[in-house]
Amino acid sequence: MNQHLNGIPAHGGHLINRIATPAERQEFIEKAESLPKIQLDKRALSDLEMIAIGGFSPLNGFMDKDDYESVVVDMRLKNGLPWSIPVTLSVSEEVADSIKEGSWVGLSSPEGEFAGVLELTQKFHYNKAHEAINVYSTQEIKHPGVKVLYDAGPVNLAGPVWLLERHPHPLFPKYQIDPAESRKLFQEKNWKTIVGFQTRNPIHRAHEYIQKCALEVVDGLFLHPLVGATKSDDIPADVRMRCYEIMLEKYFPENRVMMAINPSAMRYAGPREAIFHALVRKNYGCTHFIVGRDHAGVGDYYGTYDAQYIFDEFEPRELDIVPMKFEHAFYCTRTQGMATSKTSPSTGEERIHLSGTKVREMLRRGELPPPEFSRPEVAAELAKAMKI
């Protein structure tokens, strides 16, 4: 398939495909009994999947030491290409000692199913504190990304991977659209400019506002909710997806929006993850990417607009995707509509600030989000799911 469908090259110039061919799959299955096995957790399995389908292009496997250290320190791969998040496979000392560099390793799902193969090219120890400070800007274990890091094994395994088979998503098969397919669909829709939107929350009025602002200047919106591993207090993916469907059916023009699931796991790395999310959407064929307040943030670890400022650390041609930076949107009681400080003269109590966190807090208290926060149909769906 043409890798430059809709004219937008993947990051690094080539859309990676590491899904085993039928012949390769048969060969791997025949070798399976003799291969050492590693059981992946949910995050590692989603990383394997994203590498295989090209979502993490140009990566064709888990990072080696040179790429890892370059990304941690400089937000670039060893060849100089921008990349802001380490993508690694961490194991215990015992597991690392049991396999040799140069060998083939079977990768199994958390349920024990044979999922893929790693050609082990390197094993290396890494400094968790160094990664935590550079990637997450903190070593505090209460940060969910740091906790995952410190819970992981001390040795990283590197090498190219193959995904044995692309299975339909168990919950959202109709929205499982891989990068090669999204590019083809954008071309069929004759969209030349596409803005990607990353979300792990139900769409509230502030999200709707910035999405529609972006839609005024591009051909299409690619709504790309994350359905991989998130924090335990995030709204479950099936609930969020029903809310997205309601929004698209009632409040967006059908021919201007496309939704697909993002199987990736959240890192909660704030500014660095904003770059990462933008590059992933570039691989899916987007030309633009929405960056709002505290993108991919958690708690108070990052400044409100740090995730926007970080784009200034790269030349636009290096990223080759345009960040659309939006201020914190609010409901303005004076103008009775959504606005930002750029468009509203209101002050203080005239501004009702919205966030996914506030919606989650209201639901946990048994309160229904008001119309200023959420469309009534979405609020009703959330209330039903939370059994208010």
Swiss-Prot record:
<dbReference type="Pfam" id="PF14306">
    <property type="entry name" value="PUA_2"/>
</dbReference>
<dbReference type="InterPro" id="IPR024951">
    <property type="entry name" value="Sulfurylase_cat_dom"/>
</dbReference>
<keyword id="KW-0547">Nucleotide-binding</keyword>
<keyword id="KW-0548">Nucleotidyltransferase</keyword>
<dbReference type="GO" id="GO:0070814">
    <property type="term" value="P:hydrogen sulfide biosynthetic process"/>
</dbReference>
<dbReference type="GO" id="GO:0000103">
    <property type="term" value="P:sulfate assimilation"/>
</dbReference>
<dbReference type="GO" id="GO:0004781">
    <property type="term" value="F:sulfate adenylyltransferase (ATP) activity"/>
</dbReference>
<dbReference type="InterPro" id="IPR002650">
    <property type="entry name" value="Sulphate_adenylyltransferase"/>
</dbReference>
<keyword id="KW-0067">ATP-binding</keyword>
<protein>
    <recommendedName>
        <fullName>Sulfate adenylyltransferase</fullName>
        <ecNumber>2.7.7.4</ecNumber>
    </recommendedName>
</protein>
<dbReference type="InterPro" id="IPR015947">
    <property type="entry name" value="PUA-like_sf"/>
</dbReference>
<dbReference type="Pfam" id="PF01747">
    <property type="entry name" value="ATP-sulfurylase"/>
</dbReference>
<dbReference type="InterPro" id="IPR020792">
    <property type="entry name" value="SO4_adenylyltransferase_pro"/>
</dbReference>
<dbReference type="InterPro" id="IPR025980">
    <property type="entry name" value="ATP-Sase_PUA-like_dom"/>
</dbReference>
<keyword id="KW-0808">Transferase</keyword>
<dbReference type="GO" id="GO:0005524">
    <property type="term" value="F:ATP binding"/>
</dbReference>
<dbReference type="InterPro" id="IPR014729">
    <property type="entry name" value="Rossmann-like_a/b/a_fold"/>
</dbReference>
<comment type="pathway">
    <text>Sulfur metabolism; hydrogen sulfide biosynthesis; sulfite from sulfate: step 1/3.</text>
</comment>
<comment type="similarity">
    <text>Belongs to the sulfate adenylyltransferase family.</text>
</comment>
